[in-house]
């Protein structure tokens, strides 16, 4: 009985503290979710970060790579970016090929990258062959052929070597290309 009373008091105390925190910050659940996602994803999230984006990423982390895949059983890099754009931003990229998407985006310098921008990589034959979505702090999420959906750093030697460019979704350009 003592243990039960102690547990009830502890729970009551936690609820009161949570209410106080919610009243002072106004965003208890948002703050809690942000903290959870930071731990889950292993990256710091800015207070202005898109929680839907990070929540969606957390459900896909570890999904195996599968060429031309676009579901939780297996997904490729362009399929994954298309899923993120559809579910998070409500936008259709209109292409399932990283090289085609690269042609359509508004080109950016690396220092102009913002959360949600696209990063592109070349293969050894100098062709655009891989795409990821930029998160901030040099981190990006992508479907790696060897490790599935992961978060990587643009400063890792491999990605530094094969980085081809960056771009931003531009609805009017993508829309024009989709109508052809």
Annotate the PLM regions.
Residues 19-45, 107-108, 128-129, 134-180:
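Aromatic- and glycine-rich peptidoglycan recognition patches
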